[in-house]
């Protein structure tokens, strides 16, 4: 998915490196690393090289690196792509808790059902143009977010000519 990590480090080393690179105190970093490994369910893989992680584990370790400094805003690109359902639910809980504590999460996603379930506000952007923005309820306007997205963006494919599929 194009995500670049120092994958010859272990997960623990990568999160630690990220925190120290950002000038954080070593003791604070060490405590947060252990917390992040625990909540991301990566303790068993903490000392394995990131290169050996699955795609879902890559997502979780990247999120841990993004969270180590407790930023006010997290910008995430497809955070649930290639993540198993249990990890997805855990990440959702982590992000919801982060928001409840005052953080802001900006998500870029093509999974409209997840966006509709998780987000309070949404913006639909197509070809660099803002098509709609507001609360999820206002943008959906009585439709599912996926249907509204297709309605706003257009481009639903023609289905004629596939009668041979119904043999």
Regions found by a protein language model. Name each.
Residues 133-134:
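ABC ATPase "signature
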Residues 49-53:
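Conserved ABC ATPase signature
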Residues 16, 20, 27-45:
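Conserved ABC ATPase "signature" region
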Residues 115-117:
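A short, surface-exposed alpha-helical micro-motif characterized by mixed small hydrophobic
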Residues 88-101:
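Helical segment within the ABC ATPase nucleotide-binding domain
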Residues 74-77:
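Catalytic Walker B motif of ABC-type/P-loop ATPase nucleotide-binding domains
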């Amino acid at each position: 998915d194009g995500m670049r990590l120092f994958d010859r480090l272990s997960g623990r080393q990568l999160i630690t490196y990220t925190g120290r690179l950002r000038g954080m105190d070593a003791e604070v970093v060490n405590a947060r690393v252990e917390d992040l490994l625990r909540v991301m369910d990566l303790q068993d893989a903490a000392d394995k090289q990131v290169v050996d992680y699955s795609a879902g584990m890559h997502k979780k370790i990247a999120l841990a690196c993004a969270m180590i400094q407790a930023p006010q805003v997290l910008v995430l690109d497809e955070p649930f792509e290639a993540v198993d359902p249990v990890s997805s639910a855990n990440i959702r809980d982590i992000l919801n808790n982060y928001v409840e504590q005052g953080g802001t999460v900006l998500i870029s996603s093509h999974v409209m059902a997840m966006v509709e379930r998780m987000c309070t506000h949404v913006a639909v952007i197509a070809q660099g143009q803002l098509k709609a923005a507001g609360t999820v309820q206002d943008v959906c306007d009585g439709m599912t977010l996926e249907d509204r997205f297709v309605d706003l963006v257009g481009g639903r494919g023609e289905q004629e000519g596939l009668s041979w599929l119904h043999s």
